[in-house]
A protein has these predicted regions:
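Class I S-adenosyl-L-methionine
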Residues: 1-234
């Protein structure tokens, strides 16, 4: 199920196009079960939706930029290509992030709350730098990188760090299940609503949505959700 928004009101993304993706039966139905931020109460999936992933990869606004994040294994994600969506491997450990970079995938790292003052730093020769929107008020994705958001740069040799935020932030980097920032608050409201009101053919809906975006638009796929195939989906 897919929810599309032409102009987001989210302060961190800024007024850009965004999407939310959920399962039909479970909000976390498109997210990998292996994700350490996944709540125990949600099942998730172990399978990528290949048709939808292809749609995401292709869905870049004309003259614009698109990016997203996935908690599926880095090697299962497409390598960056010109004029395609940049799909960042979302990693739970610095070791995973370094490996993703070695595999040629752009990577981001969900860092524990107590690490906020540790960035930037190098780990095994790879630079880890915190998301600029976390370091300054009134700064967002639209302004990032002088028109080239860091997360929209596929061929990069550094990892973007997102320090834990949201009500479950203290769980990130621990053995406790959960920690997903989208588990509560305004993001959760929109995400849960996607399950009941979103477009059922999400691949087709996404392609149609992108065709209608203005030239030069920025698109962040999946404020919440992932590229998985919900268990039991046709």
């Amino acid at each position: 199920m897919l929810k599309t928004v032409k102009i987001s009101a989210n302060s961190k993304t800024g007024p850009i196009a965004v999407t939310y993706r959920s399962g039909e039966h479970e909000t976390y139905g498109t997210c990998p079960t292996s994700c350490s931020l996944h709540p125990k109460s949600e099942t998730g999936t172990s399978q990528i939706d290949s048709e939808y992933l292809a749609a995401v990869f292709d869905s870049v606004p004309r003259g614009g930029q698109a990016w997203t994040y996935s908690h599926f294994a880095a090697e299962a994600l497409p390598l960056p290509q010109p004029n395609k969506t940049v799909i960042n491997a979302s990693c739970d450990t610095t070791a995973e992030a370094v490996r993703a970079v070695e595999l040629g995938r752009p990577a981001v790292y969900a860092a524990p709350l107590e690490s906020a003052d540790q960035w930037p730093r190098k780990i095994h020769g790879v630079t880890f730098a915190q998301c600029p929107a976390e370091l300054a008020d009134n700064f967002n994705c639209q302004q990032c990188g002088g028109g080239r958001p860091l997360c929209a740069r596929g061929a990069r040799d550094f990892v973007v760090v997102f320090v834990a935020h949201g009500t479950g932030k203290k769980k990130v980097g621990t053995d406790a299940a959960g920690g997903c920032y989208a588990a509560s608050g305004p993001v959760a409201i929109q995400w849960h609503k996607t399950r009941t009101t979103g477009a059922p053919n999400d691949a087709a809906a996404l392609r149609a949505f992108v065709r209608g975006l203005p030239y030069g638009s920025f698109l962040r796929h999946h404020i919440a959700g992932d590229c998985g195939l919900e268990l039991g989906a046709a």
